[in-house]
Amino acid sequence: KLNNFFEEIPEIFTNNNKKVKLIFKKHKEDFEILANRNKLIQVFINLIDNSISLSPEGSKILIQLDKLDEKFISLRFYDQGKGVDLKDSEKIFQRFYSDRQENIKNHTGLGLSIAKEIIEHLNGNIILDKSNKSDYPGACFLITLPIKQ
């Protein structure tokens, strides 16, 4: 169940150095997906960790769960960082790719490619999407996953 899963994630990031706040917007329905819990946590950690490292101190990250249709849910990860150029939307999922100018500690260039492999293994998809929220002008990653039938 995804709503229960959401409750576990903030504990991992409560002591981030930049005091970035995680906000989860759950759906009124609770969805069950067929996924290895640890692998899904790894995807969340990769996306949230990237957002924290590229967002200003004291900013927010929004993770929003929606139902696309009877078969799929969507998870959108919004941040308040500098964003990613949409022309790089395919490149960012390649192993070792980085558009970061800063020297970011522990950055390997593997996180997004691993996240993509995991999501695709779950019969889902992950893309860089254009943020439609003015208060979250940074990156927006959209994940779609099948609902357990």
Regions found by a protein language model. Name each.
Residues 51-52:
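Short helix-loop "hinge" at the ATP-lid/N-box region of the Bergerat-fold HATPase_c
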Residues 124-125:
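Conserved glycine-rich
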